[in-house]
Amino acid sequence: MTETPARVVFTTGFSRRYTGGVTEFAIEAKTLRGVIKAMDTLYPGLGEHLEEETTVAIDGEIHEVGYFQPVKPGAEVFFIPKIEGG
């Protein structure tokens, strides 16, 4: 039996820049690192942007750094662009 893929979501601005405007993806991965690798496979070079330019929320809980954070089947993984300040 196949597990329900995670729902990976990007903001509109981020998706315009890196994924041709696509804001949602269904990705099968057990950890956040697996999600990032899968997205990098779909869009080469995207993994670096995800690691450097975003914070991630998994099922509504924000994780600053968490490559090994578990991603449960059916989870929502939302990449939030970091806000730069001055």
Segments (PLM) and residue ranges:
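Ubiquitin-like/PB1-type beta-grasp interaction modules and other compact soluble beta-rich domains
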Residues: 1-85
